[in-house]
Amino acid sequence: MIRGAFTVGAWTMASRVLGFARDILIAAVLGTGPVADAFFVALRLPNLFRRLFGEGAFNAAFVPAISTILHKEGLSAATEFAEEATAVMAFWLGLLTILGEIFMPGLLYVLAPGFVGHGGRFGMAVALSRVMFPYLFFICLTALFSGVLNAMSRFAAAAAAPVLFNLFSIASMLWLAPYTRNPGFALAWGVTVSGIAQLALVLWAIRRAGMRFIWPRLRFSARIRQMFRRMAPALLGAGVTQLNVSIDIIIGTLLPAGSVSILYYADRVNQLPLGVIATAAGTALLPAVTRHIALGEEAQANIALNRAFESVLMLTLPAAIGLAVAARAVMDVAFVRGAFTAHNAVLAGHSLAAFALGLPVFALIKIFTPGFYARGDTMTPLKIGVAAVALNLGLNLVFMHPLKAVGPALATSLSSAFNAACLFALLHKRAHFGFDALSRHRIPRILLAGAVMAAALWGVQRLLPPGVTTIPEFLLLVLVGGVFYFGPGVLLRAFDLREFLGLLRRRRRKAA
């Protein structure tokens, strides 16, 4: 198991590094112009459906089902179930892909209304979407076969597959874009071909694992029907999340040209700490809280939630402060080269600062939600999520004109804060969560250490020369932030460095 965790962790880290390199290259080649806007809208479309039907709701029902069949009935029964699921998924994905290709202008009329009337951007977005939409078919089947491999404890190929997405995207920028009139199309073809490569990789791994696949005729067996019934709650939850994403895209297209790209780059930077910390924390917490509640250990469940709250706040607060206070410096060092200008970095930095304000509360949503799921309550988080979507839409409409590209980012952060506050209030009201003595001691001190860090970063930035931030200046900001967060944190006994380093190591293992 340790070897498997190391393998997955290595591939995951490689994927993140290559993903950031891909974004740097895209920024250098496309910048924030109309081609970049059209490409990012076009990329969102297959990813929206992928997260809805592939990696999210489908895997939530498929992976537990095939794991149970594999361990109770053996490889032959698991193979039969996987074949049935593949046939059903391939049929629906193929139909969805064909319909998407036919009705692509209508889809983008809804998703990118701001492009309508701007013939160049709208036409380009339609053309790019038609190139990339088949990626949906390949990547959703890749997610299915990755679930099969994970159930068989074969983790490497599934973890390596996202690396291919980044490699093909980078290769298309380096070696195909120079020979095309529009580099956006080179990147779009790289995305689609990467889907084929990822599917080929996991199919090869399944054959190596001893599962001999045949493609059966389409049939809805009792097991498949049961799996789709179990998909329904997860599909609703995923739908709420993707509706939130869609609102941000729609509003972005209604803003001045370049806004979609600016929001994309800012969000990608914000997702780096969020993906490592929040997802890992939520994944690890749910089984622990469920186990305590099943045994009637409510006090232990509350302790688990308290320790998770502290650790997530301890890790996300300095990340949020660093990204918010030094947002311009982060964007300068990461993206200012090629077509991405210093002015683009200023605009993207403002959006990044607004996104970063919501980083801790978004992570805390991942902590509070298991408190409901572990008790069999899936509807309360869903209802709160719907209310948060409505608030996000309202705030977007209020902010879009005065704040431009900062508006969607700030609306996302504020609606996430509303979501987290509602989850906390209901858990507390139902006596399912309350701060214990250790949390009451630590949390104010963590916040105070964060305030000291913010003041120090702000002061040092005032002393730096104007203009694009250099790498030495950026490293100075990182050093100052670290010293003025960890120093007060240790002195105030909010945490100690050994505990902090231990949390980072555990987060990496759980993220893997």
Identify the role of each PLM range.
Residues M1-A512:
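Membrane-embedded alpha-helical bundles of multi-pass transporters/translocases
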